[in-house]
């Protein structure tokens, strides 16, 4: 695998664009075009702009195909990737890879173009021609409705060097360059390929590629040097000029305070760059002088906000010591600097903006008179370039010419940014979106929600049915694998939502709520039609424990044709859910409805029946026994003095007394999990309680509780006291040690250390939510083998214990877990006993056109069943790696005989930025792990990827590497390669020939 990108010839690019558009209706993977009708045009630098947005100088403006994809989707202003005297392999060798991480806020450790400067010039001129012809050919807008802006750096000597000077001259007047002549001649020679582009159109393509420039300088560049370069670009080169300014102009204290208040306290940076970079008191007079110089020459001058914001690598984000922050966390700094300069110059200083712009703020930015606006981080996320279409359409409105920046509006944007939910960091560390499996070479499409669900619910299928208001059908899908739709529709830990691809857009689909909607509307019909399985299996099964695990085991055993008796020690089914979880979390009615499903299945339910002896059950004729006894042994917290109350004991008492437990005025809850949150919220509702303090030895970011549980606790008025460790309880006061977070370890995790300080916290009652334990003594009394930790020895596949006829499920295995994990265990046990699979998959594929229509479209939570429509249909089409690749190096191909699109990685287009790794739902990196097309045998030898190099396109003869073996493959001699991979190779040779160099 080589990180060196190889530009495509103009011939190959034209062939690719025309073939793909004709065969598939797409252009470089973009399914929907933005079409400008000319009624919303703006004018800048004497040229037309159909939209004031486009890609920032960076990964999306480095290659021709990147620029074309961005244009097709809606861009009209292109800030071309920065060129400097260091280029090509020399520069590429300085970049550590992977160099991009954009799964939440963005980071990168790349900088200027990795091409040589002459290559960059050629890429931009090829793009210039392609945009001109597709504008006319595909009806996308006026051939002159877009602008290129060159970006150069980093010092005057480099910019005046022959290499960069030739680049600037060529971009200003390209008619004498060989590439301009070649592109024009090629288009004229093949003018008959076009339906709408004429030879006259081609002849009139102007050679004046750029008349504007953006200056980028390195951190620490002296103000005198910045001014000299800008003056040179204005006076000697005659460019309209933007100078990039950094957030460091705001000062260290402002930046640190803003980041901390917004939840980015973990982002580390010192004050070095703030002191070393351009200072505000130097910037203002410099910018004033440059504005005056530009005005004297009838040119425009402004600032580009913002340049990079360097931060320290602390959690192994990227293989570098320093990286550049972008996206949602950069926005509050960038817009604050824009507001500050707008006020300083009374709006007279033009601002070209980049720094966390996206669909949710771009309209307000432009309305404030801040444009053009360029984006990068948002395009690196799923949806990719297609996100531009939504932004461009949003700005389809009457446009006034630029007069000045509205300083007041810019100030409001800055004020709003620090509280904007799209920019504030989540309270907790984000969970991994990855599955614990590697991406396959074929058929990698997957619904991450289903894979993340312990019972593999067919989520996309029932969401589609709920969206169509087919509740009965949705319930049939749900109940196939889940006998507790009301319980899981109310309190499920919903790991599915953590895996939802929508997390990379805005917020996950509210899957749990959609399940509950199906249950509320389809329950009666399901119950009426629910078949009662005949008893077809010999023997009887006893299930001990009527909590979620026991209920699930009984349900699936009945589905499997077993006669089942369910023993529950208490008066009703539900276990911890019914007897402990507070009523404000789940109602008795919801639990009872799930219990009714078991009754309909004719499970013999025996409440108020405590089982002490397994031998007694065997004597009663039960041939198989399932232990779903939970984790009833109370965990303990040892203090030097004083005895805390157990959380589950309190919650049960709270429920029994309707919130009239004797607690006093001050209650302290110790713990940071979901049970601790339930406990604190219940205590807050308890009669006589005035203050509830939740104590945890680390910060809330590291609490194990789900974020929504933390939020609800805070909303209920629970007072969090972080970085405290309890010592002793005396006279209504809890003594705590004050802790502090230590630095990050090699895994990126922060520990805690003692500070030596202590504090007293008022505490009439202390409640410890520190976890429960399995009933080891009971297991041993019944002859079952346990580990040193007191846990049952079980077969991981069947959950069979040391007794061949006894199985275990739920919390009784390893301690407290989730309801849906209990259901998983219940089914696993039932299938082991029944000897058959007891639930089938429901794969209802969404229509491809409807799936693609949602890609790149940001949409917040919708009301009622419309929320189901936010599902991206990943079970039908995933293609995250295709969408997020700036270079179009991951291609979705349609292979005859294969149901879904297959992914091919194109080696020569990849620079190993690693962005596709962040968004692949597998624990894999598509650029390393997908079947790869190599341009040459030499390229193949320089890589470890599995893939192929085409030796003879006509005969389809290829050199192939497959699982470590390299061999010659031909369609007539396919031995050694799976049929599907052979089909993929043939398809590339036949239908995607433009990929072959």
Where do the model's predicted regions map?
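Glycine/Thr-rich beta-alpha phosphate-binding loop at enzyme active sites
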Residues: 22-38, 251-347, 382-400, 641-642
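Glycine-rich phosphate-binding active-site loops on the catalytic face of alpha/beta enzymes
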Residues: 76-87, 245-247, 364-391, 931
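C-terminal helical cap(s) of enzyme catalytic domains, especially alpha/beta-barrels
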Residues: 88-108, 380-404
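Ferredoxin-like iron-sulfur electron-transfer modules
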Residues: 432-452, 474-494, 526-543, 578-579, ...
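Iron-sulfur cluster-binding cysteine motifs and their immediate structural context
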Residues: 447-469, 489-519, 565, 572, ...
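Glycine-rich dinucleotide-binding loop and its adjacent helix/turn
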Residues: 519-535, 593-608, 613, 634-686, ...
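FAD-site-proximal beta/loop scaffold in flavoenzymes
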Residues: 642-665, 729, 744-816
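A conserved FAD-binding loop/helix module that cradles the flavin
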Residues: 812-837
């Amino acid at each position: 695998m080589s990180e060196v990108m190889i530009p495509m010839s103009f011939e190959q690019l034209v062939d690719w664009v025309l073939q793909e558009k004709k065969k598939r209706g797409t252009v470089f993977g973009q399914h929907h075009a933005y079409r400008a009708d000319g009624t919303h045009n703006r004018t800048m630098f004497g040229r037309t702009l159909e939209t004031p947005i486009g890609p920032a100088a960076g990964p999306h403006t480095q290659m021709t195909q990147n620029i074309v994809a961005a244009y097709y989707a809606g861009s009209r202003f292109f800030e071309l990737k920065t060129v400097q005297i260091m280029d090509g392999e020399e520069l590429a060798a300085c970049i550590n890879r992977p160099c991009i991480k954009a799964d939440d806020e963005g980071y990168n450790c790349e900088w200027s173009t990795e091409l040589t400067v002459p290559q960059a010039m050629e890429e931009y001129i090829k793009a210039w021609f392609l945009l001109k012809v597709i504008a006319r050919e595909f009806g996308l807008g006026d051939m002159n409705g877009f602008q290129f802006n060159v970006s150069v750096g980093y010092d005057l000597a480099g910019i005046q060097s022959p290499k960069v000077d030739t680049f600037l001259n060529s971009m200003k007047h390209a008619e004498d360059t060989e590439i301009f002549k070649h592109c024009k001649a090629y288009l004229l020679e093949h003018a008959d390929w076009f339906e709408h582009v004429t030879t006259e159109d081609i002849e009139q393509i102007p050679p004046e590629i750029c008349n504007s420039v953006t200056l980028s300088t390195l951190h620490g560049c002296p103000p005198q040097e910045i001014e000299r370069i800008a003056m040179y670009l204005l006076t000697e080169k005659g460019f309209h000029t933007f100078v990039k300014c950094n957030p460091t102009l705001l000062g260290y204290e402002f930046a640190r305070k803003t980041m901390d208040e917004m939840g980015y306290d973990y982002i580390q940076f010192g004050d070095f760059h703030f002191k070393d970079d351009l200072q505000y008191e130097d910037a203002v007079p410099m910018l004033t002088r440059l504005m005056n110089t530009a005005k004297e020459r009838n040119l425009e001058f402004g600032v580009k906000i913002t340049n990079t914001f360097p931060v320290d690598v602390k959690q192994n984000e990227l293989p570098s010591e320093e990286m550049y922050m972008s996206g949602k966390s950069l926005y509050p700094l960038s817009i604050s600097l824009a507001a500050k300069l707008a006020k300083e110059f009374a709006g007279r200083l033009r601002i070209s903006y980049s720094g966390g712009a996206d669909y949710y703020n771009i309209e307000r930015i432009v309305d404030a008179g801040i444009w053009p606006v360029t984006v990068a981080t948002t395009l690196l996320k799923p949806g990719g370039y297609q996100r531009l279409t939504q932004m461009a359409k949003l700005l389809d409105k009457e446009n006034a010419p630029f007069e000045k920046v509205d300083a007041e509006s810019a100030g409001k944007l800055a004020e709003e940014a620090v509280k904007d939910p799209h920019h504030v960091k989540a309270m907790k560390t984000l969970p991994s979106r990855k599955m614990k499996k590697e991406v396959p070479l074929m058929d990698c499409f997957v619904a991450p929600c289903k894979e993340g669900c312990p019972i593999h619910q067919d989520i996309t299928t029932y969401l589609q049915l709920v969206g169509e208001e087919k509740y009965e059908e949705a319930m049939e899908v749900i109940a196939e694998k889940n006998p507790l739709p009301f319980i899981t529709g109310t309190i499920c830990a919903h790991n599915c939502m953590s895996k939802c691809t929508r997390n990379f857009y805005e917020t996950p689909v509210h899957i749990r709520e959609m399940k509950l909607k199906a249950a509320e509307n389809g329950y009666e019909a399901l119950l009426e039609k629910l078949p009662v399985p005949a008893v077809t299996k010999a023997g009887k099964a006893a299930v001990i424990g009527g909590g979620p695990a026991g209920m699930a085991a009984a349900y699936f055993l009945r589905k499997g044709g077993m006669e089942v008796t369910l023993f529950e020690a208490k008066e009703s089914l539900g276990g911890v859910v019914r007897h402990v979880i507070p009523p404000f979390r789940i109602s008795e009615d919801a639990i009872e409805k799930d219990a009714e499903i078991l009754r309909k299945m004719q499970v013999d339910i025996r409440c108020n029946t405590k089982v002490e002896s397994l031998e007694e059950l065997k004597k009663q004729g039960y041939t198989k026994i399932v232990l779903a006894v939970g984790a009833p042994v109370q965990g303990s917290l040892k203090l030097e003095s004083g005895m805390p109350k157990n959380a589950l004991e309190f919650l049960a008492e709270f429920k029994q007394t309707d919130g009239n437990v004797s607690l006093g005025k001050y209650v302290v809850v110790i713990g940071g999990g979901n049970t601790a949150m339930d406990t604190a919220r219940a205590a807050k509702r308890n009669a006589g309680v005035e203050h509830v303090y939740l104590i945890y030895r680390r910060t809330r970011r590291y609490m194990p509780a789900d974020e929504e549980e933390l939020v609800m606790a805070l909303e209920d008025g629970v007072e969090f006291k972080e970085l405290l460790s309890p010592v002793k309880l005396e006279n209504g006061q809890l003594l705590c040690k004050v802790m502090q977070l230590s630095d990050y370890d090699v895994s990126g995790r922060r520990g805690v250390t003692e500070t030596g300080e202590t504090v007293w916290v008022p505490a009439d009652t202390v409640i410890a939510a520190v976890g429960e334990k399995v009933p080891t003594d009971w297991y041993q009394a019944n002859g079952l083998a346990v580990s040193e930790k007191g846990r049952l020895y079980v077969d991981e596949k069947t959950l069979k214990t040391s007794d061949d006829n006894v199985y275990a499920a739920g919390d009784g295995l390893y301690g407290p877990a989730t309801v849906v994990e209990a259901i998983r265990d219940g089914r696993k046990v039932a299938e082991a006993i029944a000897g058959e699979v007891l639930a089938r998959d429901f794969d209802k594929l969404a229509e491809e056109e409807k799936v693609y229509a949602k890609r790149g479209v940001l949409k917040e939570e919708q009301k009622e069943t419309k929320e189901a429509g936010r599902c991206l249909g990943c079970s039908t089409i995933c293609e995250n790696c295709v969408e997020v690749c700036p270079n179009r190096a991951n291609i979705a191909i349609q292979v005859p005989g294969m149901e879904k699109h297959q992914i091919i990685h194109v080696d020569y287009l990849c620079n190993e930025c690693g962005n596709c790794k962040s968004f692949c739902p597998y624990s894999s990196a598509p650029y390393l792990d997908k079947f790869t097309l190599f341009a040459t045998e030499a390229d193949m030898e320089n890589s470890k990827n599995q893939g192929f190099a085409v030796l003879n396109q006509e005969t389809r003869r290829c050199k192939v590497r497959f699982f470590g073996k390299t061999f010659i493959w031909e369609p007539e001699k396919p031995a050694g390669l799976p049929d599907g991979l052979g089909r993929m190779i043939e398809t590339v040779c036949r239908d995607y020939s433009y990929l072959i160099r």
